[in-house]
Amino acid sequence: MFEYIKLKNFKSFSDIEFNMLDRRNNPKKLILIYGENGIGKSNIASAFFTLSETLRTMDVRDLMEALISDETSLNNKEELKKYLRSRYKDIETIIKENKTVSSEGTMLLEFGFNINGKRGKYLLETNNTQIIHEKLEFTLTKKRGVYFDITESKLSINEKVFLDKNTYTEIKTACLKFWGKHSFLSILLHEINDKSDKYIRDQISDNFDSFLKFITRISCKIKFGSRQERGILGLPKEVLAEYESGSIPV
């Protein structure tokens, strides 16, 4: 569960922290936000939507490259590309849509969370075009530690996150190539989904696997203007994977 959100230069928020803890310092199971129109209620929900979008940019890259390379597949390719770009965005588009207009500083999103009593935080910071800082703190084995801390000049990934040296090296190499235009989490999730034998997933520590399941199972729906709505349904692949047939035990 989420414990707090910090947002800087995000939509209408120049600098805000939204606390989701109760009086006993535990995450609230239900939070209702109410108030007048235009005060930023939807922008808080948009932070979760934006987080989910940043996890998919590597998959978007593959999708667009495949479409561009196939010159004969579709007659209305430009219309399809326009549609895909509106639904599946690269990091620069995500920043452009969410960073406060005319803001001079960086945009920052920080999420505090609690998974099975273990607390952590995930930070994502951008300039006007790309990611410039990304960091995850969570329980490594018994104590809380830094999983990764990446900036434009530093690439620090804790080897304890992976059970296999080759996997660590493979992910680090991918980050050297793609990070900035894609987040570490997007790169890692793409590598996991790209391997049919699930090798990389098996080489991830249990606590990191718990975090990945938590962060990829966010579901939210937000409104754009008075008519348009968009949403993300975060479900494990085992759920609703086969639409043609199936059964639900009662």
Spans of model-derived segments:
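Short amphipathic alpha-helical segments, especially helix-boundary/capping motifs
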Residues: N25, L84-R85, E229
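Generic preference for well-ordered secondary structure
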Residues: F2, K28, G35, I95, ...
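Intrinsically disordered, low-complexity boundary segments flanking structured domains
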Residues: M1-K8, I95-K99, E170-A174
